[in-house]
Amino acid sequence: KQACYLAKKVKKHLKVPVSLVTSDRSRVTDFYPYEVFDRIIEKRSNNKFSKRYNDGALSHKKLEFNNDLRPLAYELTPYDTTLILDTDYIICNDLFKDVFDTTKDILLYKDSTDITLHRNFTEFKRISDTSIDFYWATCVVFKKTAFTKMFFELIEHIRQEWNHYANLYQLNTRIYRNDYSFSIAVDILKSDNIGLMPGTMLYSTDKDVLFKIEDDKLKFLVEKKDRLGQYTAVYTHKQNVHVMNKFSLNRMIGEM
């Protein structure tokens, strides 16, 4: 559902072909308007992890966490230049229209801000208190070059040797995360072939609730600081947003 919605937004604002990588092709083609995708690429996930997902401040569920296919993006993409997007990253403008002409091999987000513009989540600044800068794997541009091939091979190596790198970089989790592996790869390579995505990564946390979508306007209930279960209304207009509360995103897409 999220992938189909995002594909429509990408085609509206960026006017580029969209392909979907999924572990279950039939689930897409049997239940959703799959014609929005130019290609559907099936690749089975081998993950056995589960993760807690919040739906606002007072509700949560523990669900399967599939994140082992991102290192295979170089191998799977049918394009010479690729924009990778998580399905909970909502495109509401044409900010990315020029990224396909970048002179860099890879573009990533480093700087980020919460939709309130004043909450400060330190976990998105560095991958641990004593470690390296945080780079987002949510939204990535890459070209098919020898350097990029090496970059993604390094990402896969980090994934396979995750316990070693988690210890080396003093991480407080033993569950593999793409954001962390991309950050580690950037630190290891320290290359001018890696650049930054335009603008700033704008996000809402999974303790916030998306309660309305009106074209390119997103309306949220944002958790108040130190006020459990209390919210303030915030909206964004024509801004790309990483909506971490996937449950509320699904509900709003379902009502459209």
Predicted feature descriptions by range:
Residues 22-28, 45-46, 91-93, 200:
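Short, polar loop motifs at secondary-structure junctions
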Residues 4, 35-36, 130-142, 146-256:
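A glycosyltransferase accessory/donor-loop signature
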Residues 9-16:
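Short, acidic, metal-binding catalytic loop of nucleotide-sugar glycosyltransferases
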Residues 66-118:
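GT-A fold catalytic core of metal-dependent nucleotide-sugar glycosyltransferases
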Residues 1-8:
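Short amphipathic alpha-helical segment that frequently serves as the phosphate-/nucleotide-binding helix
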Residues 27-77:
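Active-site-proximal specificity loops/subdomain of glycosyltransferases
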Residues 52-63, 120-126, 211-215:
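Short, surface-exposed amphipathic charged segments that create phosphate/polyanion-binding patches used
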Residues 17-24, 83, 107-108:
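Short, hydrophobic beta-strand segments that form beta-sheet elements in well-ordered domains
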